[in-house]
Amino acid sequence: MTKVLFITANPNSAEGSFGMAVGEAFIEAYKNEHPQDEVVTIDLFNTTVPAIDADVFAAWGKFAAGEGFEALTEAQQQKVAAMNTNLETFMHADRYVFVTPMWNFSYPPVVKAYLDNLAIAGKTFKYTENGPVGLLEGKKALHIQATGGVYSEGPYAAVDFGRNHLKTVLGFIGVNETEYIAVEGMNANPEKAQEIKEAAIANARELAKRF
C-alpha cells in the first residue's frame, strides 16, 4: 500500500484559497483512482515544526559528544522529539503533495522549517567521498503553488524561490521526481481567476491518474 502525505501550508481553507482548492481536488481524485492507498494530511500551520535554534544545536552537540536523550533539557527534548516525528513520518511515506501559496517570492516560513526537519545527515542523505547522496530514492512529489502573478515562465521565473528551493531540497534527499502545478495569475488577471482555478483543477485531476 502506498502512503501519501498531503502537506499543506496555508492558513486558509479551500473556500478562501485557490491553491488549497486545487490541492483538495487532486487528493479527492487520487483517492478515487487509488482507493487502496493511505493519504495522511499534515497541516503545517497546525503541526509542531521546530525551527533550528540554540536548543536544537545544543541537543545535536550533546548527541555528537555521546550523550543520550536524557541529557537534554526539557525544551531540547520537546523540540528534538517533534523534529524526529516529522522526519520519521516523511521517511516512511512514498508520495508527497505540497500545497503552498507564494508569499513575497517564496512560501510561508513554516515550510522552510519543515524542510529543515527533514534534511538530516544519516537519515535522508549521507556524505560520501564524491559528495552528499540522497537516501529517499524511489519516491515522488508534487508541488501545487498558487501565485497572484505569473511566475512559471517569463521575467519573474527567476524569483520563484519557493518552487526552486523545494525542488532542490527534495532532490538533495533523494526525491528526484517532482511534478509541479502552477495556479497563477489570479491577481494580475482577476477577471480570469475562476477560469484559472478550473483549469488548474482539471490539470490536477488528470495528474492524479498517473501520480
Swiss-Prot record:
The keyword Transcription regulation does not apply. It catalyses: 2 a quinone + NADH + H(+) = 2 a 1,4-benzosemiquinone + NAD(+); N,N-dimethyl-1,4-phenylenediamine + anthranilate + 2 NAD(+) = 2-(4-dimethylaminophenyl)diazenylbenzoate + 2 NADH + 2 H(+). Keywords: Flavoprotein, FMN, NAD, Oxidoreductase. FMN binds at residues 102-105. Coiled coil: none annotated. Belongs to the azoreductase type 1 family. This is FMN-dependent NADH:quinone oxidoreductase 2. Binds 1 FMN per subunit. It comes from the Bacteria. GO terms for molecular function: electron transfer activity; FMN binding; oxidoreductase activity, acting on NAD(P)H as acceptor; oxidoreductase activity, acting on NAD(P)H, quinone or similar compound as acceptor. It holds the Pfam family Flavodoxin_2. It is an enzyme of class 1 (oxidoreductase). Homodimer. It comes from Bacillus thuringiensis subsp. konkukian (strain 97-27). Its EC number is 1.6.5.-, 1.7.1.17. Its cofactor is FMN. Quinone reductase that provides resistance to thiol-specific stress caused by electrophilic quinones.
